[in-house]
């Protein structure tokens, strides 16, 4: 496991909670003023912090229909929201759907620790033919002096299917070798959908970097996911009524993190009782 990963999250099997941002100015679903949006997201982050999540990931989840290139007004609004709502002290990341360049720019401007995105591959998607370029994003990171911003590669993205015949394990290995992925993510078919456990196992087996489950995690399946993955990103199951685009439910978030901490203690105890090498 990467040393930086443990230094950043300061725990095994970190839980990264989503701060889903309501539709931003310019988006068809935008209903709130920017001030109201900031207030909404700050409340969510406060509730997540009270639940003691390990990190927060800001994402413009309700900027539907999704686009592959963020608009200037989206980037400006997202930057303001993150600056005003980010945790006072704590780890946080940025994901501007589905524009990795915008994600890196906003992350650098706001002091984020990581970005999540689709950086490699070619996909048939709801947004059309999708062919991201990890090399350009990595070079942008270098140009602006953001080398400390880690790149979390979603190699099984939502709302899309990969073209070609490579397996998830093959895509995972090549993303590490040719595109220098810091972390790999495995998702379900859409936001809130469970990731395929066998795919997660294949990717984990092929990986030398941390692997996180990216969607569909809830109290009921958390244990089996954490037995395989190095952590989880969770959003929908922490929301009021389990509705992806709703506000965070403080009680759901609290229960989820209590379950996560209990599972981590159990995993640590199991690890400590494993037999060591035979003595000579």
What are these model-predicted stretches?
Residues 99-112, 171, 206, 213, ...:
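Catalytic cores of alpha/beta
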Residues 15-19, 56-58, 92-96, 115-117, ...:
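Hydrophobic faces of well-ordered beta-strands that scaffold small-molecule active sites
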